[in-house]
């Protein structure tokens, strides 16, 4: 059995030059609570379809990397009983027949391997606060320096060190552009407070940028920052209070590594009365729609 298997619908779409959008599964397994996670996973696939593209949710089932999951496979990953798998974990999962949800790093790698050019997610991983001591930097960043995939996201998760993350992306040579904005998106917030050098004004410009990468000999991906509209963002003062208390609790409990992001996302959900969860859903659905529209323009060659 091949270690990477696109679903028949995905394989047919790629063979026919039709637009395909990859979706990660860590959002399902660790990013959202049950039963919202499965509902949002289905909503993302439906959002991609409504914009005229084929969704390819990525995950590992029984040691096989599936690019495009069926209903039972989605339910398995939504059960909360599977681990996160980054790109480095894929060989071990394949060798042991394990199942797991793919992070941005693993999803970008597998999408690129199959020839998928667009990938939608909520927020990237990045440089954690205090990384000078912990060296805790997400593998998502290095993966995007190697995988020629455009990732549509709402910046990086606002619990991270956003300026340091942008510096790291620059060091790695990964282009970062805003969609109709010269400010880097702040995940739950419209604006992270970090300026961008470049922006694209529509889906056509975004598609042209993606097409330009291989011709220029750049084998990397690109980050397309798609901010929430101001009226849809989390209240900034509420965000600040939740972040401050979450970081204090994190330090008190000594939580580190892979457990940091799920803990803080759950802390945000509790401290905001579920408002962060609703903002997360809004932003990831918007990103899926935008990625599908860009994929459609890319497939049309214009």
UniProtKB/Swiss-Prot annotation:
Similarity-based family: Belongs to the pseudouridine-5'-phosphate glycosidase family.
GO biological-process terms attached to the record: nucleobase catabolic process
Binding site for substrate: 84, 104, 138-140
Designated name of the protein: Pseudouridine-5'-phosphate glycosidase
EC number(s) given by UniProt: 4.2.1.70
The keyword Coiled coil is assigned to this record: no
Keywords: Glycosidase, Hydrolase, Lyase, Manganese, Metal-binding
Cofactor: Mn(2+)
Record InterPro entries: Indigdn_synthA-like, PsuG
Subunit structure: Homotrimer.
Reaction it catalyzes: D-ribose 5-phosphate + uracil = psi-UMP + H2O
CC cofactor note: Binds 1 Mn(2+) ion per subunit.
Function: Catalyzes the reversible cleavage of pseudouridine 5'-phosphate (PsiMP) to ribose 5-phosphate and uracil. Functions biologically in the cleavage direction, as part of a pseudouridine degradation pathway.
Active site: 24, 157
HAMAP family documented for this protein: PsiMP_glycosidase
CC annotations in GO: cytoplasm
Binding site residues for Mn(2+): 136
GO MF annotations in UniProt: hydrolase activity, acting on glycosyl bonds; metal ion binding; pseudouridylate synthase activity
Class of this enzyme: lyase
